UniProtKB/Swiss-Prot annotation:
SMART domains: FBOX (SM00256)
Signal peptide segment: none
Entries under PANTHER family matching the protein: BNAA05G37150D PROTEIN-RELATED, F-BOX ASSOCIATED UBIQUITINATION EFFECTOR FAMILY PROTEIN-RELATED
Source domain of life: Eukaryota
Pfam family for this entry, one: F-box
Domain F-box: 8-54
InterPro entries, A to Z: F-box-assoc_dom_typ3, F-box-assoc_interact_dom, F-box-like_dom_sf, F-box_dom
NCBIfam families cross-referenced by the UniProt entry: F_box_assoc_1 (TIGR01640)
Designated name of the protein: Putative F-box protein At1g47800
Amino acid sequence: MAETEKNLQSLDHIPIDVLFEILVKLPAKSVARFLCVSKVWATMIRGEVFIRSFTSYSSPQKQPRLLFALVDCLRLYNKMLYFFSKSTLVSTPLLPWDPAPGPPVKPHRFGLFWRARCLRYLPKHYKSLMEELKPKPLVVEEQPDFLSRKELRHENSSYVHGLMSFLCSGEQVIFNPSIGKSITLPTIKTSGIISQSFLGYDPINAQYKVLCLTNVTRFCEHQVLTLGAQNSSWRMIQCSTPHYCGEKSLCIDGILYYSAFTSFTTVLVRFDVRAESLEVASKFPEGLKSSNGITLINYHGKVAVVSKNYHNDHHDFNLWVLEDTKKQQWSNVLVSFHTGVTGQFHGGLEVLGTSDMGEIVFAPNHFEEFVVYFLDQKSNRIRSVLL
């Protein structure tokens, strides 16, 4: 015991600048272990300067990886949420109703449904901080607290800058899918019920904020919480246009967009994460017949509303791109291809977003194999990735 304390004391004598240069060059998994060495090390590693230096140093060495989630809907309310990456060979259940061991997941066309809103890309500038996903046993040795809760319900999730936010048994949970860690946010003070909870990221101040919408009367109240801030608490903010929120959200360059409904029409609401201001960005385009089944994606740095049309022999997707917020000007892009491209998966495709290369990413609703499609509009070519 005395020898261990002596070794730890000798580590604290390493100059901070030298220690900084050593740690910033290590893999993310090793850096995470060093959080336990001492308070000095933990403070430095969690500091904003170290995080930014670490990401800028390590990001060129990493390739974008695909992360997606599956919900075992055969269990009805007895659900399990599985996360996979391109290198994962065995699934890891992260949201089991019953933590008892179970058989490995076997994909079945009608047994598992792709939850498209959970599939996103790990950002280049953040993914190096997240532990590499490797094959893990089906039973997690140290499960997060919320895994043992009963009446488990996985609600609409949002994925931003490496973290996920969703409602779990009425509580708001922030989850890091790469390392399997989660936190439960402070209880929000409201007389109503939580309608939606969206996660946003401010790249200038490197801050995450949660926008919680509660259904008190006919319209929603809005409260904001900053993650990681000292004495952080929920703050009430106002919107000049009363509205009721939809399900879809998207964060681009510090602006969180989400669909909403006013007394007269469907709108796109804009939340400035840094300024904590809310306003209606635009009404939905007139050519969009229905807001049901829409998706919000980042289309070359602009927010786009995606709707799909059903046909027997081809897939049609309408991309409504918000070109000018002040003029509420939208452009329309039609994406169409024959079902022969996707073979047995033509039962239904979803647009999941865009890749770092600007490709539009599709995935089937029902499947027998894990497959993702990438459409390059410039070359008009489609490639598939079988996981």
